[in-house]
């Protein structure tokens, strides 16, 4: 097929296999050597036939809650590991390091409605995790508007097609694309970050994703997945070249979207409509809150409100 396609369209990029929401590698029947990984066998086949260069991108869907549902708040703790586990499985089973990979469709659909801020936290954590893992891009599903205000559509509309309110994931996207990363059409440098904010069970309650933006500012996206408590944290940047830590200095912009900026009020249901659900309204439904922090070295504390996405943006000093 690649040969025939390229005969007609020489520059057509070819890739796949568009895995659908798989939580791990995809197995097939075992071959004579006992190898069951479809990914491994697929790349071995291309390599043995001298066609690996025809394969220019690896694609997959990501729906961590599609089969099992994620009604419990604690399911948020799993998302970075969900991402890292499946991508590492593909790398371990033959995904060539030079082939870019893309999440071409995905969401937290089983709990992605307007009635909770949880899907916003999931989206921010997911995007930070998958880009840190090396993805070439990620694509949101779905943008189609919905007339059911409690459903998973990106924007709810009325009968005349007018937007009636803003969903948590819409507002989270505004924070990610307008506050964390800017300008979105220029290259950013993404650095791995770690957090030691954990609960008694060992769950990481706060995750962090650090960008060096084209304008020279450091922009740290933090997701406080603690539903009940705020946290105050210090932030340090490891300067490997100088062999020391550096810290925010001067004015740091702080943008927050979370439980205080989005509150859902369900409509009362008549007894005859017990199965309906979903109807209601959000008040407030954004915008994200803004403030500044005066940073002065290692001891500076940054407040992270409960159940929130936080962007801290500023410059680091030489202290």
Language model region names:
Residues 103-207, 214-215:
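Aromatic/acidic polysaccharide-binding cleft in carbohydrate-active enzymes
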Residues 45-47, 89-92, 125-128, 143, ...:
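Generic recognition of flexible, low-complexity loop/linker segments
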Residues 63, 106, 143-144, 223-226, ...:
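Histidine- and/or cysteine-centered catalytic micro-motif in compact active-site loops
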Residues 1-126, 133:
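Noncatalytic carbohydrate-binding groove/subsite architecture in carbohydrate-active enzymes
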Residues 316-319:
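Short, charged beta-turn/beta-strand-edge "cap" motif at the junction between a beta-strand
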Residues 243-304:
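Acidic, Ser/Thr/Pro-rich beta/coil linker or hinge segments at domain junctions
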Residues 59, 103, 139, 219-222, ...:
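Structured core elements
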Residues 199-245, 252, 256-261, 308-313:
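Carbohydrate-binding surface patches
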């Amino acid at each position: 097929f690649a040969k025939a396609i390229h005969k007609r369209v020489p520059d057509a990029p070819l890739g796949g296999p568009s895995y659908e929401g798989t939580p791990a590698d995809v197995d097939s029947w075992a071959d004579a050597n006992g190898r069951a990984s479809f990914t491994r066998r697929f790349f071995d086949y291309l390599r043995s036939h001298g066609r690996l260069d025809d394969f220019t991108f690896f694609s997959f869907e990501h729906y961590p809650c599609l089969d099992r549902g994620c009604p419990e708040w604690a399911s948020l703790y799993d998302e970075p590991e969900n991402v890292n586990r499946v991508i590492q499985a593909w790398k371990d089973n033959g995904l060539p390091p030079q082939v870019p990979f893309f999440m071409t469709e995905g969401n937290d659909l089983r709990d992605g409605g307007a009635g909770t801020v949880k899907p916003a936290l999931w989206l921010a954590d997911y995007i930070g995790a998958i880009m840190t893992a090396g993805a070439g891009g990620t694509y949101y599903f779905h943008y189609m508007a919905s007339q059911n205000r409690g459903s998973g559509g990106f924007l709810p509309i009325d009968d005349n097609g007018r937007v009636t309110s803003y969903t948590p994931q819409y507002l989270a996207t505004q924070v990610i694309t307008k506050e964390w990363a800017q300008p979105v059409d220029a290259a950013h440098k993404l650095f791995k970050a770690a957090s030691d904010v954990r609960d008694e069970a060992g769950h990481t309650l706060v995750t962090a994703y650090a960008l060096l933006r084209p304008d020279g500012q450091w922009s740290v996206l933090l997701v406080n997945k603690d539903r009940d408590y705020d946290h105050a944290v210090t932030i340090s940047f490891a300067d490997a070249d100088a062999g020391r830590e550096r810290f925010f200095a001067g004015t740091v912009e702080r943008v927050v979207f979370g439980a205080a900026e989005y509150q859902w009020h369900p409509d009362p249901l008549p007894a005859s409509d017990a199965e309906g659900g979903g109807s209601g309204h959000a008040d407030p439904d954004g915008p994200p809150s803004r403030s500044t922090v005066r940073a002065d070295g290692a001891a500076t504390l940054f407040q992270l409100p409960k159940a929130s996405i936080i962007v801290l943006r500023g410059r680091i000093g030489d202290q």
